[in-house]
Regions:
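Short glycine/serine-rich loop/turn segments
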Residues: 71-214, 259-261, 374-393
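An N-terminal boundary/leader segment
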Residues: 1-52, 284-286, 458-467
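Residue-level signal for inorganic ion chemistry
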Residues: 31, 50, 224, 256, ...
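Conserved acidic residues
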Residues: 40, 169, 370
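Acyltransferase
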Residues: 21-29, 55, 269-293, 319-324, ...
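Short helix-loop capping/hinge segments that flank enzyme active sites or metal/cofactor-binding pockets
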Residues: 70-93, 251-255, 308-359, 375, ...
Length: 467
């Protein structure tokens, strides 16, 4: 069972901090008590450091200093981000050189706001995988199955678990093919992938400079909007403005395309049905639903299946900067790096040209619709035992990223909202993709949609591991 503090939304916490009815230290102590070692969310859970940061946030409040909406808020950090005072491993068995501890703009912004860093969450090695498997450190447990160890999604594999257990309200992640949205979906959370280039990647271990984006996982879409406004350079301090837009947004002003059948085909039992039911609810509430062909999605999926560019770029980076780390790579990661060896420079450049053209061509689709909707994942989180070996891992990894990678390849912003449970009792997500640069619009519409459909807690209930 969770404490009353754990039930508070980010908006409620922000208000209570400023009204003096709640302290950051009390909230952080609750977060520490909620942490469950057995779920394995963190590589480095920093109790003492978090309490010290909470005390600093409280002291600032007492002095009348308000540094931003995330002041005093518990935040978990994916172990790709440089964070002063703790080593960066990027999912590897040995720490990366000291240069990878340097903080980038995202972390620096949160530190300036006196956000509370709870620790480093686990990641798939080098962020190169969608299921969340890590043989070096152990794979975090998906809290939605109390009997079988199921994967939590990756590569930000500890992020969603940290939110569900209650040790954080914001989880920092990264998304190259779905690494924010996949774990958010598999653990019943909200996951925001920002538009490519919107947030600085400085201070974050690079998987693919061509496709990497920073993002956040939260418990609700409203929390995601507030987190976005705390981090995004163009929207810092504008959370009230966006919240007002949400309140005035009429359902009929939202137009959603259900996209091509390739985003719906092959879904495991209960997934497509749950998403269709959610879209039906939106339609009955007045949201305009249209069927339209988005041919670029099929081309994006095909490019991903033949390899796209992340594997090529990761191998080059490792060979140039961390050659000895290749030798100790997790088998499920090493096999993918190895498969990139056969791609020559000409093919790599061809793929870059295709990426650029697809991202350009798809923009015209958003002249008539606001969002593209589909299931976030076509599969249910598999049991860890089924994907521990390369043979079982490879096809499930491809399937887990099939729908999310479309957002990366086409240069879109995207979000996943939890909308129900599949036939196996595991979370199902509704993915919404928006035009490049329309992140604030996407979040506003996601919040309005959440008001119609309900939050994760309202639609999914409590994860079995916490009952």
């Amino acid at each position: 069972m969770k404490s009353t503090l754990q039930e508070l939304s980010l908006k409620e916490i922000i208000f209570q901090f400023r009204s003096g009815t709640l302290s950051s230290r009390d909230l952080v102590e609750s977060a520490i008590q909620s942490h469950k070692e057995g779920l394995g969310a963190y590589r480095d859970f920093r109790r003492d450091a978090a309490l010290e940061m909470a005390s600093l946030a409280d002291q600032a409040f007492r002095c009348g200093t308000d540094l931003g909406p995330l002041q005093g808020i518990p935040v978990s950090v994916k172990d790709l981000y440089g964070l002063s005072g703790t080593r960066t491993y990027a999912g590897s068995p040995k720490a990366l050189p000291g240069a990878f501890e340097k903080e980038g703009p995202v972390i620096s912004s949160l530190r300036c706001q006196h956000a509370v860093f709870m620790g480093k969450t686990h990641t798939v090695e080098f962020a190169f995988g969608g299921l969340g498997v890590n043989s070096h450190w152990g794979t975090p447990r998906n809290p939605w199955d109390a009997n079988t160890h199921r994967v939590p999604g990756g590569s930000s594999c500890g992020a969603g678990v940290s939110l569900q257990e209650g040790s954080a309200w914001i989880a920092l992640g990264s998304d190259t093919a779905g690494s924010v949205r996949v774990p958010a979906c598999m653990t019943g959370c909200v996951g925001l992938k920002t538009s490519f280039g919107r947030w600085s990647l400085e201070g974050i271990f690079p998987l693919s400079p061509t496709l990497d984006t920073a993002g956040i996982l939260t418990r609700t879409a409203e929390d995601a909007l507030l987190g976005f406004c705390a981090i995004d350079p163009a929207y810092q301090g504008r959370q009230a403005e966006l919240m007002k837009e949400v309140e005035s947004l009429e359902p009929a002003s939202i137009c959603i395309s259900t996209g091509d059948t390739n985003l719906w085909d092959g879904c495991e039992p209960g997934i497509a049905e749950i998403v269709e039911e959610a879209l039906g609810e939106l339609g009955r509430a007045g949201v305009r639903m249209v069927e339209s062909t988005v041919s670029e999605t099929e081309q994006a999926i095909e490019l991903f299946r033949i390899g796209s560019v992340p594997g090529i770029e990761l191998k080059e980076f490792l060979m140039s900067n961390l050659p000895s780390w290749i030798e100790t790579a997790d088998p499920v990661v090493g096999s993918r790096i190895k498969s990139s060896s056969s791609v020559d420079a000409g093919e790599y450049l061809r793929r870059l040209r295709v990426l650029k053209k697809l991202a350009s061509d798809v923009q015209s689709h958003f002249e008539t619709v606001d969002l593209i909707a589909c299931p976030t994942l076509p599969i249910s989180p598999p049991a860890l035992a089924e994907v521990s070996a390369v043979e079982g891992y490879a096809p499930r990894n491809v399937a887990s990223l099939r729908n999310t990678v479309v957002g990366n390849v086409l240069g879109l912003c995207g979000i996943t909202l939890p909308v129900g449970l599949d036939a196996s009792g595991m979370p199902v997500g509704l993915q919404l993709l928006g035009k490049h640069g329309s992140d604030a619009k996407l979040l506003s519409m996601a919040c309005r949609i959440e008001k119609i459909l309900g939050t994760s807690r309202q639609r999914l209930g409590i994860a079995p591991c916490f009952k």
